[in-house]
Structures are given as structure tokens and as C-alpha cells.
Amino acid sequence: MSDTAAALKALLLEKSVRTGTFTLASGKESDLYIDCRVTALDPFGANLIGKLGWAAVREKINTENLKIDAIGGMTLGADPISLAVGMTSAVAHPDEALQVFTVRKEPKGHGRGKQIEGNF
């Protein structure tokens, strides 16, 4: 495990893993709750996620000879992750900087009614 991955693991354990009594989305109870958003929204966590994510994207680009222009996913979970990777890409390789996008479950009910936001 790389130093970056080890640091992210430690931060996840510190910030995102909780014990106690929790009601899950399914309605079931659990004595363990993991909320990775807490780590992803932490500036140090975002930095580590960005480094690891950008390394994974670069590996995919190189091994499969791909051209990747953007990164994103469903809001809210993907937002801090894709932004961290996009920002890291811009700092590390400005000529290959990834645009970031987010996808809503439903189109907006006002304005331009967009379901996907980003710089395309």
C-alpha cells in the first residue's frame, strides 16, 4: 500500500467510521456506520483522494490508450471525489485537466432544466 493510500485509510478510519446505534436507509439497525463523504469533504481527504484518483485515471489512460476529458457522477456522493480528481489533474498535468460534471436524479425544475451540470 502506498503512503498516500495508507494516509487515506487512516483518515477514513478516523473521520468516517462510527460505532453506535444507527438506522440505515433500509430501515435496519446497525452498530457500524461508514460515511465516506466526511473524509471526501475534508481538505486533506480530498487531496489524498485526488492524488489516488488521478493516478488511477492516468493508469487507465496509459494501459488502454484512452482519451478522457471529464470525470463525474451522481450528486452528492460523486461530487467531492470527481472535483478532487479534476483539481489534481489540473495541477499535475494542465494539458490533460479533466472537466468535472455532476448528474442530478431529476432535471432541475427551473432555469435551463439541466440534469447534468458541468463544463462541456
What are these regions (language model features)?
Residues 32, 79-82:
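Short active-site-adjacent helix-start/loop capping segments
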Residues 82-120:
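Short, glycine/charge-rich flexible loops or terminal/linker lids adjacent to PRPP-binding catalytic cores
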Residues 27, 71, 100:
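Conserved hydrophobic/aromatic pocket- or pore-lining residues that grip, position, or stack substrates
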Residues 36-37, 74-75, 103-106:
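Fold-independent oxyanion-binding glycine-rich loops
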Residues 40-43, 79, 110:
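Loop/helix-junction capping segments adjacent to catalytic residues or to phosphate/diphosphate-binding pockets
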Residues 64-77:
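Short glycine-rich phosphate-binding loop at a beta-alpha junction
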Residues 45, 72-73, 109-112:
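Glycine-centered small-residue hotspots that permit tight backbone geometry or close packing
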Residues 1-63:
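Active-site-facing substrate-recognition patch
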